[in-house]
Amino acid sequence: MSLFEQEYKKLNKLQKEAVDTIEGPVMVVAGPGTGKTQILALRIGKILKTTDINPDSILCLTFTRSGVNAMKNRLLQYIGLESNKVKVSTFHAFAIEIIEKYYTFLDFPQIPNLIKEDEAVFLVDDILENGSWDYLRPRTNPQMYFNDLKSLISILKRERITVEEFEKQIKKDIEFLENDPESISSRGESKGKVKKEIEKKIESLSRTLEVVEFYRIYEERKRESFLMDYDDVLEFVVSIVSNSEDARADIYENYQYVLVDEHQDSSGVQNSFLKAVWGEVENPNIFVVGDDRQLIYAFSGANLSYFEEFANYFGRTKLITLLDNYRSTSRILDLADSILESSISKGKLKSNKGGGESVFLREYEYPRDEILSAGLYFKSLIEQGESLEEMAILVPKNHHVRTANSILKNLNLPVLDQDNLSLFSLNKTDSFLRVLRIIDKPFDSVSVSLSLLDKYSGIDKLEAHRYLEENKKENLSLDNLLENRETGLFANENNIFKWGKTLKSLLDKKDKKLSFLISEIGNIIYINNSEDNHDLLENVEFVRTFIHLALMFETKNLNPTIGQFLNYIERLKTYGNHIDVATLGVSKGIQVMTLHKSKGLEYKYVWIAHMNEETFMSEKRSPFALPEYVRDRLAKRSQEDAKRELYVAITRAKEYCTLSYANLNYTGGELNLASIIQELPDIHFIKKRKDENELELLENSINGPKIFTSSIIDLALEKGESRVLDEINEFVRENYKDTKVSVSLLNNFFECPFKWYFRNFLKLPEPKSVSLALGSAVHNTIEFILKNKILPKAKELESFINQDLRKEGISNDKEILRLSKTASNIIEDFLASFYKNIAKDFSSERSVSFLDKDLGINIYGKIDLTENTSDGRIVITDFKTGKPKTKTEIEKIDEEGRLSAYMRQLAMYSYLVKQSQNREVDISQLFFLEREHNDKNKVYITNIDNEKIDLLLRDIKDYVESLENHHWMDRKCNFKSFGGKNDPCPYCALAKNIFLK
């Protein structure tokens, strides 16, 4: 008996009916674990065994490459080598084949290529770089809207909304708002005027018109380059089969039998393709299988109506419902059925495994505790001999995956990411790129300085830190490292000199082929210094990835330079591109993935974490205001969507399932259990309260690793790095008084102690951001005007600003043009609104300092503008570029009882004037140079009283005491990223990389 016959005999009655019904349209509603893949494969085998059809006349379409591979493997087992002739393909791959054959119907002169991810990055970057964008390219973060633009354009295409239609609907909404009587205020000061909220809506929609222009340019540039993106593919193929009778006939004649997997995930475009080819065929042999309860691709245009429509569109369709589940226990299936009922079939899933264990619902204080508990649970299972491949943690979002992976790795648990490891997630990637930058530019002081702190430099930590503290240079270069041979603190061939020599040997190979140079760097610095076999394997994989990137870059560019390659890599990194590390083998580990990605998989043990209303039900807000017509057509995250996703997640579990949630987020905000879980009957769960779960965690913490500690100092102590910490602390205590205490120093210290350490203590050079360069150019121009009391003409002003921007390191002519225009507008507004009102007796950019004898430190500040008014008052002004801050933000006292950075600055200036001149500052003000004309926050004015001075002095004393007592590393990091990003603190990341290496 063949394997096919053996497997066929195992089928139940309804499964056999699905396999045996090979003629006409058939729709199978197959719940999770009911043998869907098995049925598809056996049905293809049945067709080949009972008809004289050739294997290449069968078309099987699915949605993922993994689905294609699974089907091909199953067919090979059942049918043998003949199965290779069966056309098993994803929708997109099949569509591309049709496009390659009939591309002339799309008015392409040659076959269009599918745009690669890196090509898309550079195309978008080029459009943003060369366009005149007021909104889409923020100065603080030019790449800010990259993913939002991609996502919105993708959705518009899947909904088949053209550029013209999108623009028309935006203008229609604006016109309606402008003319709607309800838009006019009927009371108060604004009576008769457009309401403020309506003004904001109109302004937001007007900004979205920039997206229209971007969309138009993006499409034009793709077509000019004979490119198509992922969403074009299906639209193009529908256009071909709709307009070409030859193409339709070709497909229909080639494929007598069509099978579609996961049909509930079909989008409107995919459905249109099936209807265009087989819609006019009487009784077509189309077989679709899916489950309405597992529709989780609504974001990509999938809609339940397309699945339901099949039953009626292709004539008398046979409907078969499969409810016998061979995966999960009854308790798991009962819970799943309570969450969601099928809208197509009646009946509940029936388990062939029996009752099984109850599902746990666990409550925790914080989200991190959920993952710690899951990790400890899996750790105990591993110790009992359970297979790692049977364990999975499912979470709502991708960022939860990254956090969970990090926590599990800190528990020394093996983790197998569903996605390959990203090159940009590795610390050694930054190290490698630094070496390349030094070879490209040996006088790159930022890269040279940071390279000394790299693990791979071979330099002792304290030795590197002492060298940097004693050589506080803005222009530290490779030559300085080579000069360190026989002079200074270190003898002859010390580690700093050796590192310089290694870099010099690589610099001497700069003219070699790029891929050869990268191979040399990899071998000399990484592979040859591997600590053990595991480290060697990781380093080989890492270096192979870089060599592969270099080889690809060489094929696209003739004689590429290091600088060009660095620019290529940096752009990919900036835009969040994912580059897989080229792994040599498949490792084993706990699988961590989103609920969405778990579809089609199964595990004995499943832990579903972060089941909070605020987390699970949250949608990413679009930065673009959309017209009502488009909003109504876009998929919204409803209760039903969430239920389907949870249904899929729970039915991944074969025997054991746990759900967990937290009460508080990381910032202390309240969290609640997801409402769709709260609504479920208690009978489905064994509930474990927060105090019970915390007790378990504490017991494990006493008997094992300190799972509640995550500070750098605690992690360093765990890794046996206490000597290094003691040395660094003593090194700081001995030398911190050499650095003057300024308000920027204090602000850095209380934001993040490691920001202070690297910026103010070691004074590591840093690349200057575009915003800082603009701020410096504006401040320098204002200082020039104030000191010389000359109003420059427009051309002179532009020339002065341009020169200053170049001094600040801006070399791109287009960037200079953009920044120069912004700076000129700021200065012109300053001259019109502020300069004319300055007191006659004033001084600008005045440095003030004094020695605090009690603390033994110099306190210092530079005041932008000091005015002595005619009535004897002193007015201090600090000029600020960037978005204006509200009175509340400036006057806010933080949770430690400290002043905001802005108020601390004003308090410092008043204190300095009092100590150095024995005079009181009467008025302290912040003038925001980039405010809108009608912004009430353009100037903040206050008087610094003794209470604020006392808070400033407390900050200074706390600063000194924490350094003297070695407590500064214990301080909490309060870093907040700018420009809409949610990045981790770069200074803490650098510290972890150094102290935990």
Language-model region placement:
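Short, polar/flexible loop-turn hinges at active-site or ligand-entry regions and domain interfaces
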Residues: 52-57, 77-86, 102-116, 128-143, ...
